[in-house]
């Protein structure tokens, strides 16, 4: 995953424009968890769609940015204790293309008021969720079977509308490339890495978790083995589901043309590719200073190139 992450970050850095970048997190209320768990592909896809539409529609409003930004979205479904916690990380450029194909950049911090963002997102998600319900395109597990009843559904929807779906604006980046480096931490993550696992016994698994508040020390979480496996498997995405998606001027269909125009308007590209065209051995050496052709024990050249692989020098 580390190599894939390096390559992904390198590719995205070359797409960074000269503007501030913002990290926005949209989180779904836990009351939706039973419905989410039995409609994963459909409702995760709906989350991607609603986050993107919310950001794009508000950004295009002249009161806020009046332009189409670039957006990278990454879906996560867990928290530090591996509980079901569905949320979307979005990196949003503070600049974009206007309808007359000019560049406009935000001069503020985050350019959309949080309350406006919250209301738009909540309204969109619940309206589209209600459409799926009316079209009978939702599945119901025993834990949410009661929602088949239209009166129960209306009551459920009213409760969701009354909740505060407040998005979180986590970071503002003025160093350009560091926004992508930051998001790179999220793109190739899985629910838990080996480095967090402290011990495994016949009956329990112990692992570290961040403190519940900023500045709190790390804590140890211990779960029965079966519960650890259950929680881990909750975060396996449906086959073929794309957890990383691109919108705005980064949408795949028009990305090359949009970036070419933006770089022309801004006087050049901010960053160049670091690892383009490198073999795996060259990338490992450039990124981590690790030369796989040299024996780590004695320092001698132990391997020689043999096409795309290496052979032992005998």
Question: Where in this protein do the model-derived segments appear?
Answer:
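Beta->alpha loop/short-helix hinge microenvironment recognizer with preference
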Residues: 1-314
